[in-house]
Amino acid sequence: TAMMRSFENREDTFVIDEPFYAYYLYKTGFDHPGREDVIKAQSTKWEDIVELIIGKIPEKKLIWYQKHMVHHIVNGENIDWVKFFNNCLLIRHPKDVIISYAKQSPINGINDLGYLQQVNLFKKIKNITGKYPFVFDAKDILTNPEKYLRIMCKYFKINFSKKMLNWPQGSRITDGIWSPYWYKNVINS
């Protein structure tokens, strides 16, 4: 979410927050905090979500930062739409993910954490696009944000903006309806 904030602070970028979350909750039946509100707020139809995310960038922006969670792609869905994007995987150490996730919701199994799905997604993106997705560790961004954001921007052939390093404290209109449950730390950052 902090990465989404970083990109949202650019003047040329529109962000969307976890567009497949309602689909995931609907499909799996998992009882996450605010589940019914999420399902009411977003489409639960895979095709509608794909149509949205491959459509025109809203507000005539040049960049569309889409925050996805790998485990929201449940099983076997067609993800050929990744060919329209510059793909990037943000990874975190399992210990950090487990601690963070468990504070918000019970862990039903390894699939909740997304590691197996990340490996599969990495391979699928390579097969569909012909190139490996850009992968970086969240710890690197936290340790030296400017250095790693510059590396990322260079890789994606976009200009780095110092605005990516700071953002106003508080929630955003672009935050998912689930933000009160999951985003406390980033809202206060």
Regions inferred by a protein language model and the residue ranges of each:
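Glycine-rich phosphate-binding loop used to anchor ATP phosphates in small-molecule kinases
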Residues: 52-77
